[in-house]
Every structure is written in structure tokens, then in C-alpha cells.
Amino acid sequence: MAAAAAGASGLMAPALAACSSGSGGAAPGSQGVLIGDRLYSGVLITLENCLLPDDKLRFTPSMSSGLDIDTETGLRVVGCELIQAAGILLRLPQVAMATGQVLFQRFFYTKSFVKHSMEHVSMACVHLASKIEEAPRRIRDVINVFHRLRHLREKKKPVPLVLDQEYVNLKNQIIKAERRVLKELGFCVHVKHPHKIIVMYLQVLECERNQHLVQTAWNYMNDSLRTDVFVRFQPESIACACIYLAARTLEIPLPNRPHWFLLFGATEEEIQEICFKILQLYTRKKVDLTHLESEVEKRKHAIEEAKARAKGLLPPGSAPGLDSATAGFSPAPKPESPKEGKGSKSSPLSVKNAKRKMEGPKKAKGDSPVNGLLKGQESRSQSRSREQSYSRSPSRSASPKRRKSDSGSTSGGSKSQSRSRSRSDSPPRQVHRGAPYKGSEVRGSRKSKDCKHLTQKPHKSRSRSSSRSRSRSRERTDSSGKYKKKSHYYRDQRRERSRSYERTGHRYERDHPGHSRHRR
């Protein structure tokens, strides 16, 4: 194919080039390349195909979305004013601001104001134009400037922009809008500005020394950026119209036989049309951006309702009135929300919470302190004493000190009594010290029974008191009997070990009589 870049669909007039037999991979005799529903035989990059045809001007995408011509024109004017004001605050050259406004006008002749945010596209055009004209600005600075302009337009005190998730989302939307602008314009973003052309034409007319005339023509040219003249006429015709209007305003005579603009290829009809469009700006009333945005929102909701009705989601007569302020442009309310329906069923979590509330007072009663100690603490002390008694190994009992204490006892019965006392449940400490030990022992036995029933873990006790043997059942007595047998078994083992230890001790004393003195 002839060139390497594609023009925007619908924006540029089709400029077709003949297909060569070997270039671009096209087969000989082929009619072109079908892209979408259009047939292209080539692409021609030229500034002449950046002008809109008449059919695009008469029926724009915004008009097809339901916006009237006045609202669309107001949005175009406000968007270009925002770009100009932001360029001044960003200290961009005038050429960059002009490029941004032209790109803005071109884009919204291919896309609708209803489907694309005017403010986001304005930011994207400023950011893109600054890079095109070799004066790049950071996207953060662009966002901050537009944020300040919005506050000033709404007559609010400017507040610094917060760097939160909303800022990140806005930044991503602007980047996407910039890509969309490039795609819709076919990456043909070059703009030929009439700034230099005005100075060159005034030099030909020998009026370049009249600074007032030059500045006035320049001002008219900057104001024409808010209109659609840059997508309808050549830059040479726009430059001639700005000079013509400035000379008529300042009452400076210019050659008219023949007319001077004919020398530069402009016609009288084009000059009059451009002057009429520029002067219309000064007779327009100041538009309110909030009113324009509300109109756009109305159209958005109307389109969404039409789509929902086409899909059968909304009945034909259930659409709310768009003019009612109280409706808020939301679809018809449902008789019962899904949250209310879910709330009627009891969830497992709510049942669990109710059980906890019921068990709360029972737990509090069970944890009431007895004799200054909680039941849990009492059971812990009992378990500790039992663990200590159980952990006494035969080796420990067979130590010399233990042997000495055992030999000091009078009878085996007294030995068993001392052992049973040491291994029985230790009574809890009394808060009232004057209480007798016997009553506290009875209370301790009762507490230990309660704890055993609560925890459902029966502990085998080695105490041989008559009160416990009466209260226990047959099964427990059997188990205690078994345990007693076991205890006798361990006791016999300890005795045998102690005897063997005594024998070895006597043997040791015979061999080494000096050491026996120290042991005694």
C-alpha cells in the first residue's frame, strides 16, 4: 500500500491511492483491503483530508445520541476554554494550546459527548498536545490544573487534590482517553496553524509594522479555535478571515479591487462564513457547565433505559419520568430488596451467637468462686499435686534420704497412711484461717467431685479415706482395688530396690569403712 498510517474513520475524507502489484503485499488485480465495512486501496497522508464533509457536519454522533445542537455547541466551547485556561496555567506555548483544541474538535466529530466525558478528553488533549509540540507536561500537573479550574468555576475555595484511589482512577481514565483520541484520529495529529501565515500575509500587505493589527488578527484566530472552522476550512482561508475581520474592526483600509484575499487562494464566501462563526462567539450567552452536564446525564439514562427495554429487562410502561427531580433517574424500585429477603432467614452465624448468649450466664454461674478460689483453679491445683505424686519414680524413693525416712517409720501401716496423705487431693487454701481443717477437707472432696463431673475425666485417686469409699459405687471400688493392687506392686518393687540398695551399702561399708562415717 502507498502509506503507513490510517486516517480516522469518518473524520478524514477518503483519499485513495492506486494499489501497486508488489508493494504492501497486495495481490495483483485486487480491489483493495476490506477493513470493517469499508474498502481501502491505500492511505494518503495529507492535511487536506483532515477537513470534514458536509454530511458529517449536519449530523454529528452527539446528535444521534439525542443531544440538541445548542448543548453540543456549548460543550465544545466550554471544552476549548478549559484547554486554553489549563495551557496558560501550565505555561504551554500557544501553538500547543491550539493543537489541543483542534484535536478536541476533531475527536467529538467522531464520538459522542454522551458516551465520552468532555473533561477527561480535554485533559487527554492537553497532555497529548504538549508532547506533540515538544513541550511535555506531567499528567499529574494536568490533573491538578483542571482540579483547580473546576473549583474556581464552581466558585469554591481551591483545595489541593488528595492522592488517593480516586486520583489513580482518574489518571488511568485520562491515559485511556488519550489512547482513544489517537485511535480515532488515526494517529494523524499534526495541525497546520495559521499563526505564521498571518504574519507572512501582513508582510505581503506591508502592514506587519502595525502591531495593533497583528495582535487583533492573532486574537481572532485564537478565538476561532472554539468553533468548528479548523475542521471545515484550510488554515490559509482562516488567516485571511482573521486579517479581514481585524482590519474592519480597526478601520484600516486594504486593497479591494481586486480583493486582497483572492491573491492567497481564499474566496469571499469562505471569508464571510468564517467571520460569521467567530462573531457568533461574542453574542452567545455564558453557558453553565452544570446544566450541560445534567443534559448529558439525562441522555445517558435514557439510552440505558432504552437498551434495558430492548433486552426485556424493563416493561414498556415502567420507565420513570426523566423530568422529575425526585426520581434521580434511577429505574423503578422493586417491591422487596434482596437484602430484606435474606434477613428473614436465620443464618448459622446468628444461631451460634444466640447459643453463646444463652450459655453465657450458665458459664458465669459455673465459674463462681468457692472459698476464694475458682473451680478451674482448684482442679488445676489438684491435678498438679497428683502429677507431682505420680511423677515420683522408684529411683527417687530409693534415694538415701528417702530410705532413711522410711526406716524411721514404725510400721508398714503408718507408711501407707503417710503415702496416702501425700497423694490425696490437697485441700484449697482457706480465706478464713480460723476454719477447721476437717471441714475444708470435706469441701475440697466435694469440689473435686464436681470438677470430675464437669470435665468428664475421672481421675484415679489413691486415698483410702472411709468417706470416699462409702460414696463411691461398686465400679469405682473395683477400679480402686485394681489400682491398690498396682500400688502394692510398685510398693513391693520399691522395697526390693531399697533392700538391694541396703545390701550394696553394707558391702560398700565393709570395703571402705572410712566413707561410712560421712554417710552417717
From Swiss-Prot:
Instruction: Tell me which Gene Ontology terms the entry assigns under biological process.
Output: regulation of RNA splicing; regulation of transcription by RNA polymerase II
| Spans annotated as Cyclin-like 1 | 81-183
Spans annotated as Disordered? 309-520
What InterPro entries has UniProt attached to this entry?
Cyclin-like_dom, Cyclin-like_sf, Cyclin/Ssn8, Cyclin_C-dom, Cyclin_N
Q: Which cysteines are joined by disulfide bonds?
A: none
Which SUPFAM superfamilies would you find in this protein's record? Answer: Cyclin-like
Similarity section: Belongs to the cyclin family. Cyclin L subfamily.
Localization terms from the record:
Nucleus speckle; Nucleus, Nucleoplasm
| One GO cellular component term | nucleus
Residues covered by region (Cyclin-like 2): 196-280
Q: Where is the composition biased (Basic residues)?
A: 454-471
Q: Supply the PANTHER family for this chain.
A: CYCLIN
Q: What does this protein do?
A: Involved in pre-mRNA splicing. May induce cell death, possibly by acting on the transcription and RNA processing of apoptosis-related factors.
Q: Where is the composition biased (Low complexity)?
A: 407-429
Q: Which residues carry this modification: Phosphoserine?
A: 330, 337, 347, 350, 368
* Organism (species): Rattus norvegicus
Q: Spell out the subunit comment.
A: Interacts with CDK11A, CDK11B, CDK12, CDK13 and POLR2A, the hyperphosphorylated C-terminal domain (CTD) of RNA polymerase II. May form a ternary complex with CDK11B and casein kinase II (CKII). Interacts with pre-mRNA-splicing factors, including at least SRSF1, SRSF2 and SRSF7/SLU7.
**GO MF annotations, alphabetized:** cyclin-dependent protein serine/threonine kinase regulator activity
Keywords assigned by UniProt, alphabetized = Cyclin, Nucleus, Phosphoprotein, Repeat, Transcription, Transcription regulation
RS: annotated span: 384-422
Chief location of this protein within or outside the cell: nucleus
Swiss-Prot/TrEMBL domain comment: Contains a RS region (arginine-serine dipeptide repeat) within the C-terminal domain which is the hallmark of the SR family of splicing factors. This region probably plays a role in protein-protein interactions.
The name this protein goes by in its record: Cyclin-L2
Q: Where is the composition biased (Basic and acidic residues)?
A: 356-366, 440-453, 472-481, 489-514
